[in-house]
């Protein structure tokens, strides 16, 4: 009990000293620097790193039994980035490809959502996608992501394209995946993939 009283007394004494010094009521003695009036330096705020993620999801018919798990995997990537420490300035965009309901003149690719920090909207758009036949032009999807997304101009920005599908990436008759990836790399964009299928497959 005496120890607690002593600790409390010391704490109150420290508080009183702190208040007394901060008011500057007493002038410092001659020749003694007025250290009480020195303003402590404030730590500089750490700039938030921009992270831009473009999701390219295969919505062709062959993904019918796989698309739900693909969406879950992609959303797990979004959550992992969003929960990083320190928290990044995260924006996510969405592209679908390989769906017969899309314009064939574009190579059956469509930008569903530009880069946005509204992750609720990303979730709604992602999980609303459905499958419907089609040709899977992976290179065209990567190219659309590079050309149509409003990528950050910040030199510190991390720019990523995630392609998720289950078919060979060689179906595009106009653009090869190598060409699409090289063009992305030239713009400091990293291209990653999630394969939806058996691990023993040649496409894995």
Indicate residue ranges for each PLM-predicted region.
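Acidic, polar low-complexity linker/tail segments
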Residues: 18-54, 60-68
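Bacterial N-terminal signal peptides
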Residues: 9-18
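VWA/integrin I-like adhesion module and closely mimicked acidic/polar interface patches used
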Residues: 167-204
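Von Willebrand factor
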Residues: 46-164, 169-170, 197-203
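Surface-exposed acidic, glycine-flexible loop patches that form ligand/cofactor-binding
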Residues: 28, 40-48, 81-86, 146-157, ...
């Amino acid at each position: 009990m005496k120890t607690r009283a002593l600790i409390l007394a010391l704490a109150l004494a420290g508080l009183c000293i702190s208040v007394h010094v901060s008011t500057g009521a007493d002038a410092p003695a001659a020749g003694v620097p007025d250290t009480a009036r020195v303003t402590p330096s404030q730590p500089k705020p750490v700039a938030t790193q921009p992270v831009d993620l473009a999701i390219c999801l295969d919505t062709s018919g062959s993904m019918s039994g796989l698309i739900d798990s693909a969406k879950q995997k992609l959303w797990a990537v979004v959550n992992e980035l969003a929960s990083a420490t320190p928290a990044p300035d995260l924006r996510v965009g969405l592209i679908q490809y390989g769906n017969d309901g899309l314009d064939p003149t574009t190579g059956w690719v469509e930008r569903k959502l530009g880069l946005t920090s509204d992750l609720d909207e990303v979730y709604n758009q992602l999980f609303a996608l459905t499958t419907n036949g089609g040709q899977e032009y992976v290179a065209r999807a990567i190219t659309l992501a590079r050309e149509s997304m409003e990528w950050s101009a910040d030199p510190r920005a991390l720019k990523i394209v995630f392609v998720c599908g289950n078919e060979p990436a060689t179906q595009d008759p106009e653009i090869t995946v190598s060409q699409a990836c090289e063009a992305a790399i030239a713009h400091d964009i990293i291209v990653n993939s999630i394969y939806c299928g058996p691990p023993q497959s040649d496409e894995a």
